[in-house]
Amino acid sequence: MDLPWNDERSNKFITNVGLITTNGPYGADVMACEWTHHVSYRPGLIAVCIGPNKATHENIKQTKEFGVNLCSTDQSIMSSVAGGYTGSRYNKINALKELGFEFYEAKKIKATMIKGAA
């Protein structure tokens, strides 16, 4: 996917938290990632920084797949839950579903995606 200069979709990277979704040894998981950066327009590339001792890192290492969901302005609670707990001990997806957040299955990868995210 190419993102031409001044494309409206690029503006979503300015201040949004990235929610990284995975599905692997730790099950379906979501992690808040402040370090989600738009690095190229053509091709459209995103860089994320994930610590090596995180459940998300292990899920990605095992499956080679992850989803990047950019928080919408009404998803600050989701960001707090995703960033405040470890996926190795807590099922954050189920907790967020109980809070009313919705998810869907991605078309090309096995990671769960967040409904309403950019």
Question: Where do the language-model regions lie?
Answer:
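Active-site-proximal mixed secondary-structure blocks
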Residues: 1-118
